[in-house]
Regions:
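A short, exposed helix-loop element centered on a Lys and neighboring polar residues
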Residues: 43-44
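Conserved NAD(P)H cofactor-binding loop of Rossmann-fold oxidoreductase domains
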Residues: 4-15
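Short glycine/proline- and charge-enriched loop/turn segments
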Residues: 22-23, 75, 116-125
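Active-site loop of short-chain dehydrogenase/reductase
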Residues: 12, 50-63, 98-101
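Catalytic loop of short-chain dehydrogenase/reductase
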Residues: 7, 23-27, 31, 57-84, ...
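PG/GG-rich flexible active-site loop of Rossmann-like NAD(P)H-dependent oxidoreductases
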Residues: 9, 63-66, 105-113
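C-terminal helical subdomain
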Residues: 98-107, 113, 121-166
Length: 166
């Protein structure tokens, strides 16, 4: 199972506003449900069957906001609940690894190539920061097929031309 959900509303922060003054509570609540409640509910449905089978993979697709918050980047600032996704992956790793279930948090620290992404000013100015979705899928497949003797529980994918978020 790959949990990969996002939310686009509320990404534009006017220069004269601060996040708390601009962001309606309803937008935050939707983002929080997607980033914290969503993966919990999917895991609650999927992991017991994986535990019973003694095998399975649960991968959480995350972003750099799970590692640190950033000022004035609304889309990422809004997603600080993604820290909860990372914590959930860590807890599920502790609980389910011994039952043969591989859980990992995958941090996609960049822009994923798509027509919409290519239209963004940042992607047009620096095309090398755009990540190939096929290569991202390859990384997910690599995690899924890893030998149990050396599972990866967190993987950060970053374009070569940028510094990884920490």
């Amino acid at each position: 199972v790959v949990y990969n959900a996002g939310y686009l509303e509320g990404r534009e922060l006017p220069p004269e506003k601060e996040l708390l003054e601009y962001m309606p509570v309803e937008i935050f609540e939707t983002a929080q449900h997607i980033a914290s409640r969503g993966p919990f509910l999917v895991a609650k449905e999927a992991l017991p069957a994986m535990r019973e089978r003694g095998e399975g993979t649960f991968l959480i697709s995350n972003n750099a906001a799970s590692l640190r918050g950033r000022k004035r980047v609304t889309g990422q600032s809004l997603y600080y609940p993604r820290v909860m996704m990372r914590s959930l992956a860590q807890v599920l790793t502790e609980e389910y690894s011994e039952h043969g279930v591989h859980v990992a948090n995958v941090v996609i620290d960049g822009l994923i190539d798509s027509p919409g992404t290519r239209a963004m000013p940042a992607a047009q100015q620096q095309p090398e920061i755009v990540m190939d979705p096929v290569k991202i899928a390859d990384a997910f497949f690599y995690l899924h097929t890893q030998d149990r003797s050396c599972w990866t529980h967190e993987l950060q994918l970053t374009p070569f031309s940028t510094h990884p978020s920490v």
